[in-house]
């Protein structure tokens, strides 16, 4: 009807054109990226590469990453035609080449489901097959509709996107964040590997606050639950900050730095999309005893990329080996080891006891996600972002890492989700609830 009205206007003609269409829209906009018409600068930077004033070029995400393969080549033909337009002779021609199809490992339903659950939050989610390394989802929220970049957006739309305080253009899964208690299983693995922590040792019930000695002044490490015995398994289940502060002190600054470097800190993740490098300090060392203690429970100056965190967690179900994540689909995928013996195989079972308890023990902080049909393990985390220990105006980052523990599981999966500003809305429990809903759909989907 609209087309008919337009055609009734003298001089108006309609024509069909082919455009790029992003069917996942907002759900994968940071991952897929978008193409745009080339600029004069593009033509200068890519001179001799087959671009013309009518070309489009990948700007970000997969579109930018695989631009050379997706682009293809334009064709043309010079021919002689008669007065009726019939070709009499082809003088010269260049056959066009279509761009290659790029197939990803992404599970589109899981990608959409994670987006729908978290779309109103400032956060991100990563999903992997923990045994093969296939990345099943990469979600950043809030997001934008990348189709708007194809058809062109108004200056008002562009201004609104850029000035939105929730930063929908900001790709959160590429950044580094304070991991909070999701870091504790890593500290447990390092303590066991270095021989500095005995998993059955009772560290003693210190109540809900503790400091090593008076040299710490007024600084106290606090925790939420008192329990006994204070062993590694229970400390993971109850998410005990004091236990892991003590564990970090036992490990020592040099041991911790070296061990974290060995599992990918301060180096690029071997992945198609460039991610920010995880760090254990703003400098090249852990400066103080308090910083070391805080590092033990994922605070201090620890910052971790979500995909890196997910990759480290693969070691807990692969005999201590960290599996390399990848995005481009491969037939008959088998896990490629990125870092071998990140943790000792015999120690992994000790860590698994704790992370299984987080999900399967009614006292565990992630028990909401418990299922009777699939054995799951995981860790919650609530990272405090504030200027000082006494600061009450800071924010909290909520985390949840959860994964299948059996390689024969029908639908193996590992999910890491992070949400900013969970203070006052349930902390990490807010993230646990949403990921539980996602997993329910995932496991029940045929």
Where are these regions (language model features)?
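Short helix-capping/linker segments at secondary-structure and domain boundaries
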Residues: 36-44, 194-197, 318-323, 445-446
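Beta-lactam-recognizing serine transpeptidase/beta-lactamase-like catalytic domain environment
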Residues: 82-84, 89-91, 131-182, 186-419, ...
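Extracytoplasmic/periplasmic proteins that interact with beta-lactams or build/remodel peptidoglycan
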Residues: 1-124, 139, 144-171, 176
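Short hydrophobic alpha-helical segments used for membrane anchoring or interfacial signaling
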Residues: 125-130
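Short, gly/Ser/Thr-rich active-site loops of penicillin-recognizing serine hydrolases
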Residues: 335-337, 432-446
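Short, charged, low-complexity patches
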Residues: 59, 309, 427-439
């Amino acid at each position: 009807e609209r087309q008919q009205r337009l055609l009734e206007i003298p001089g108006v003609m309609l024509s069909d054109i082919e455009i790029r269409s992003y069917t996942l829209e907002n759900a994968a906009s940071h991952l897929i990226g978008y193409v745009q018409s080339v600029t004069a600068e593009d033509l200068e930077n890519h001179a001799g590469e087959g671009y013309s004033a009518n070309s489009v070029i990948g700007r970000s995400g997969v579109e930018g990453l695989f631009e050379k393969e997706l682009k293809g080549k334009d064709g043309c033909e010079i021919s002689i035609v008669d007065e009726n337009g019939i070709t009499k002779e082809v003088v010269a021609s260049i056959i066009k080449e279509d761009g290659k199809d790029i197939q990803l490992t992404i599970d589109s339903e899981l990608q959409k489901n994670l987006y729908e659950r978290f779309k109103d939050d400032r956060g991100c989610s990563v999903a992997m097959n923990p045994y093969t390394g296939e990345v099943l989802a990469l979600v950043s929220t809030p997001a934008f509709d990348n189709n708007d970049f194809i058809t062109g957006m108004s200056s008002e739309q562009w201004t609104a996107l850029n000035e939105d305080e929730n930063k929908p253009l900001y790709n959160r899964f590429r950044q580094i964040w304070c991991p909070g208690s999701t870091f504790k299983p890593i500290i447990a693995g390092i303590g066991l590997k270095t021989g500095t922590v005995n998993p059955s040792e009772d560290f003693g019930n210190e109540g809900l606050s503790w400091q090593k000695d008076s040299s710490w002044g007024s600084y106290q490490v606090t925790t939420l639950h008192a329990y006994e015995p204070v062993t590694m398994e229970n400390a993971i289940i109850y998410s005990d900050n004091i236990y892991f502060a003590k564990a970090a002190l036992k490990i020592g600054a040099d041991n911790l730095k070296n061990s974290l470097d060995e599992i990918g800190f301060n180096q690029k993740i071997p992945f198609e999309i460039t991610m920010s490098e995880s760090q254990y300090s703003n400098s090249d060392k852990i400066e103080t005893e308090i910083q070391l203690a805080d590092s033990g429970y994922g605070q201090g100056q620890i910052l971790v990329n979500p995909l890196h965190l997910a990759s480290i967690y693969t070691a807990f179900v692969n005999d201590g080996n960290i599996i390399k994540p990848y995005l481009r689909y491969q037939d008959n995928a088998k896990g490629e080891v990125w870092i071998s013996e990140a943790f000792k195989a015999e120690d992994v079972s000790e860590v698994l006891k704790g992370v299984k308890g987080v999900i399967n023990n009614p006292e565990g902080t992630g028990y909401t996600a418990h299922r009777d049909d699939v054995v799951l393990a995981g860790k919650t985390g609530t990272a405090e972002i504030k200027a000082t220990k006494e600061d009450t105006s800071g924010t909290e980052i909520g985390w949840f890492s959860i994964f299948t523990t059996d390689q024969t599981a029908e639908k193996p999966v590992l999910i890491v989700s992070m949400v900013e500003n969970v203070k006052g809305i349930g902390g990490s429990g807010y993230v646990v609830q949403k990921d539980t809903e996602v997993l329910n759909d995932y496991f029940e989907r045929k």
